[in-house]
Every structure is written in structure tokens, then in C-alpha cells.
């Protein structure tokens, strides 16, 4: 039976801000800083999806995250590969994956750890306004 989480310790673009439900793939520190800085002054919900190419539960969640992002287009969804942007992952202590961190005005307000789509939707509903 598979697990709904992986641990970072298990294995050692263009920026389209989403008003239409896309997930922004964060590919560089500069891109991350640009997105993060633009969200600091906003009451808009930022959902950071911490993932890795080797994370099975992350891959399983990817289509669900895209589906959820399309439903909640008032939130911004950003995917961060923990191996590519280790400093960002470290800032948010994204050790067990997938990890979904909810941020408003530059501050973490909640998180969901693991492949738990129902819990993810519940937290988005709770924090989107």
C-alpha cells in the first residue's frame, strides 16, 4: 500500500499569475521573489505546492492540484521543486512532501502535508476570502 507523503530525506517560464486557474511553475529564485513580493501587499491567497520529481504522492496529486486551481481562480497556485529551490523549501520547512503552504500578505497562515485533496480544498475554502 502506498503512502500519501514522501520525505526530502528519502532521496538525496514564464510567469503567468493565475486569474484563470493555472499553476505557476516557479523555476528560479528571481521568479519566486517576484511572485512573493507581488503577493505581500495583497490579501489574495497564495498556495505553494512543494514537490519533487522523485515524489510519487506529488505526481499523483498534480492533476488534482490543477483541477483545484482551475476551480479556485481567485487564489494563486505556485509549484516549487524542493531540489531546484532548496532555500525556498527550507524557509517553509517543506521536508515531507507534498506540502501545501498557504500564505497571505507574506505570512504563512496554514498548511496541508500529504496527498490529501479533500483537506486541501477545505483549507482553500477557509482562507480564500
From Swiss-Prot:
The active site is at 55 (nucleophile), 58 (nucleophile). It comes from the Eukaryota. GO terms for cellular component: cytosol; endoplasmic reticulum. Its main location: cytoplasm. InterPro entries: Thioredoxin-like_sf, Thioredoxin_CS, Thioredoxin_domain, Thioredoxin_H-type-like. The record marks 56-57 as: Contributes to redox potential value. This is Thioredoxin H7. Residues 6-129 form the Thioredoxin domain. Disulfide bonds join 55-58. Pfam families: Thioredoxin. The lineage of its organism: Eukaryota, Viridiplantae, Streptophyta, Embryophyta, Tracheophyta. Keywords: Cytoplasm, Disulfide bond, Electron transport, Redox-active center, Transport. Belongs to the thioredoxin family. Plant H-type subfamily. PROSITE patterns: THIOREDOXIN_1 (PS00194), THIOREDOXIN_2 (PS51352). Probable thiol-disulfide oxidoreductase that may be involved in the redox regulation of a number of cytosolic enzymes. The record marks 49 as: Deprotonates C-terminal active site Cys.
Amino acid at each position: 500500500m502506498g503512502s500519501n507523503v514522501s520525505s526530502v530525506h528519502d532521496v538525496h517560464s514564464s510567469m503567468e499569475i493565475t486569474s484563470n486557474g493555472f499553476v505557476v511553475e516557479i523555476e528560479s529564485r528571481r521568479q519566486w521573489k517576484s511572485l512573493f513580493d507581488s503577493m505581500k501587499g495583497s490579501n489574495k491567497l497564495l498556495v505553494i505546492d512543494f514537490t519533487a520529481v522523485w515524489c510519487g504522492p506529488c505526481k499523483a496529486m498534480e492533476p488534482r492540484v490543477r483541477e483545484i486551481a482551475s476551480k479556485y481562480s481567485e487564489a494563486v497556485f505556485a509549484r516549487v521543486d524542493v531540489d531546484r529551490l532548496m532555500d525556498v523549501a527550507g524557509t517553509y520547512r517543506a521536508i515531507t512532501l507534498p506540502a501545501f503552504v498557504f500564505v497571505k500578505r507574506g505570512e504563512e497562515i496554514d498548511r496541508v502535508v500529504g496527498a490529501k485533496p479533500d483537506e486541501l480544498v477545505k483549507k482553500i475554502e477557509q482562507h480564500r476570502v
